[in-house]
Amino acid sequence: MAKTKNEKEEFIRVGTTLYKLVNQPRLNGGYVKKRIVWNNETLRQDYGKDYLATVPKYDGFCTVPDHVDYRPVVDKFLNLYESIDHQPKEGDFPHIQSLVRHIFGEQYELGMDYLQLLYLQPVQKLPILLLVSEERNTGKSTFLNFLKAVFQNNVTFNTNEDFRSQFNSDWAGKLLIVVDEVLLNRREDSERLKNLSTTLSYKVEAKGKDRDEIAFFAKFVLCSNNEYLPVIIDIGETRYWVRKIDRLQSDDTDFLQKLKTEIPAFLYHLQHRTMATKKESRMWFAPSLLHTEALRKIIRSNRNRLEIEMHELILDIMESVGTDTFSFCYNDILLLLVHSQVKAEKHQVRKVLQECWKLTPASNGLTYTTYQFNYNRECRYEPIKRVGRFYTVTREQLESL
């Protein structure tokens, strides 16, 4: 069917490639703007030979995020980052405030800082936000949908498989990459996620196209019903902010729509709010501020069986003999493990001590006091003096693991 002048489609030329701009219908209503590679000859057939000269031309693509002073074109380069159409306006936002308080709890001000940084400093690196709960109806998905409503097309919902795919052009230039049911419990998944959260540039790859390196500023928000092992997190890891989310007290089916109507007031507040924190790390927040019990639970779940056995054994010795420190060499702990019916090799023990617990032995062979099994004693352990390059671990260190 022929189109009238008012119905003419939009075209652009980027470099030497012609694109048609279309609105692709979404399953749940609305549209998403897409660029489809077009053909010069087809354009001439539809609109005549002179129409091509009127098509806007750009030298290439760029990705420059900005929510306040957005520029669709930067120095003759078409900005792939999309504007958000909210107009900040002073007002109240009680429903948004209640959601942020529910998600961040006692860390409410940190949560507000996180959202403010997303809005005003979109290129700032931020921790991987992981929301966990075994319960249903906790508001985790509502929070993800709220982020999507605020930042619109700059938020993409990924699946676990998307992280493993070599093709990433759909999400590499986004502000937020969110996953509603994350389960990335393979070591290579965890390493990729950590690397993406801190990298400054990334190679974009699409099917049938050459790889292209772009600046990477995406932040990750993950949700999981698995409180113990949604991702692999090692001891000392500072890139995760894990929040345990409680069940909602009520279920309001119109809650998301109420959130959407408050977004202009919320953005106005973020523009004028004073930050509660200052930049203290590459991911803004001091790691100590983000160390939660939910994070410790995941770290403990990631430990191997030998580490757990050593941890429990040494704490048992401390409790039994009434001490807060324990010194030992490899042979001491191996003998104690044998008495506990635990088989272990010296290299396995070394790995736990040096890689997992970050302990270093004494620089020289010195006299130290350790403990060995003695079933004739009430406490089951007796002190013994030995000489060697021993390790020392404290109760505080063990309880922080």
Predicted regions and their residues:
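Conserved nucleotide-binding/hydrolysis micro-motifs of P-loop NTPases
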Residues: 183-184, 225-229, 246-251
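Conserved AAA+/SF3 P-loop NTPase catalytic/coupling segment centered on the Walker-B
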Residues: 176-197, 230-236
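Conserved catalytic/switch belt of AAA+ P-loop NTPases
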Residues: 190-212
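P-loop NTPase catalytic core of nucleic-acid-dependent motor ATPases
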Residues: 67-176, 241, 270
